[in-house]
Amino acid sequence: EHDITLMAVGDNLMHLGVVASGKQEDGTYDFSMLFQGISPFLNAADIRIINQETVMGGNSRGFSGFPYFNSPTEVGDAIADAGFNVVLQASNHTADQKLDGLLYCADFWKNKHPEVLVTGIHEDASQADDIPLLTIDDVTFAILNYTYGANTETLPLDLLGHLNLLCAVNEQTGQMDFTTLNPQVLEDISRAKELADIVIVCPHWG
């Protein structure tokens, strides 16, 4: 027998003051200082989870804070460089830059940091049923991530299948029912139990 340790932190919520703190003299951004203080603890864990609350929808859009965030991709670089190996990307701010921003964010993770398991969003809606898996010392973990909503009562229909939601959604109108659990959640958990030794569910409540 042996131990497998898990560390989870968040929310990594990039208000504009935090964004400004990472700006360098040459105009580039470096956010490594955000995680320097926790690195010794972080690197002692096997599973290192962070909730990246704000979307990285592309630097060319410009950066924005509350209520509709857009964060620098250098935040993602700092997360990966710090040693996080799981990123929870489903939050109420994931759709702040609409579908284009979500897709940019998903593509950034896939191509820039493929070593990081990103859960909660899908670049391809046909992959919405896929179960994110992480194997540590021959033990397989399913790590599921859902958000309660997306900063609106009505979800843009083009986001269906791209963002994991806790609430039920009318697929014709996009109306979200915050009192009813999305049946996809229980279906995912059921399939995850078949694929993994341990299932971890990370809901974003607010």
Q: What residue ranges belong to the model's regions?
A:
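Acidic, metal/ion-coordinating pockets
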Residues: 1-206
